[in-house]
Amino acid sequence: YAQIHYPFENLKEFDNRQIYPADFIAEGVDQTRGWFFTLHALGTMIFDSVAYKAVVSNGLVLDKNGNKMSKRLGNAVDPFSTIEKYGSDPLRWYMITNASPWDNIKFDIDGIEEVRRKFFGTLYNTYSFFALYANVDGFDYSDPDVEWSKRPEIDRWILSLLNSLVKDVDGYLEAYEPTRAGRAISDFVNDNLSNWYVRLNRRRFWGGGMTVSYTHLT
């Protein structure tokens, strides 16, 4: 309730059940008899309703050898220095794609660097490649979309894979499977987009006249 400042704000949306009960909540497995239960108990007593429709019970973050982190053992990782060094997005992506939320994760700093290099580095290089040649050719983002039948087969192939990816990721997220969603996105970027599409189309970009491809790459 505090997240939406109820009952001091958002009364109408809350009372009309637009934002309550919550679609899902996420906490550590240790909250099964704590927060998970307390929210339902309060919701039932006050509103005669469950407090949430689904729950994601998070596992524990262990060290890379599978041991519980502890200052005493010297295997704890400082999250603030880690974010400062590697960035928050690589850290998030590493944790999302490493293991399902309900499983324990063996945390390895080297894995964050690998994610930053392989996924984010590849994504950045792909965008930089597109931006370079789109600017050289004077591509206008306001140009109308190119008809499907006028697109080269390889362009239709990557678009088909992208549409399939969107459908699959939506399904994974609806089923509370963020790890499968993240891995599907990583595979698309690293394999299909970078290794196949960009590599096979380099000569087309170098030769100019790439309005068709620029349009769908945006």
Where are the predicted features?
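Structured secondary-structure scaffolds
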Residues: Y1-V136, I158-N201, F205-W206
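Short amphipathic helix-turn modules centered on a small-residue break
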Residues: Y141-D143, L193
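The feature captures the catalytic groove of carbohydrate-active enzymes
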Residues: K150-W157
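Catalytic palm subdomain of template-directed nucleic-acid polymerases
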Residues: G209
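Conserved small/polar residues in nucleotide/adenosyl-binding loops
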Residues: T215-T218
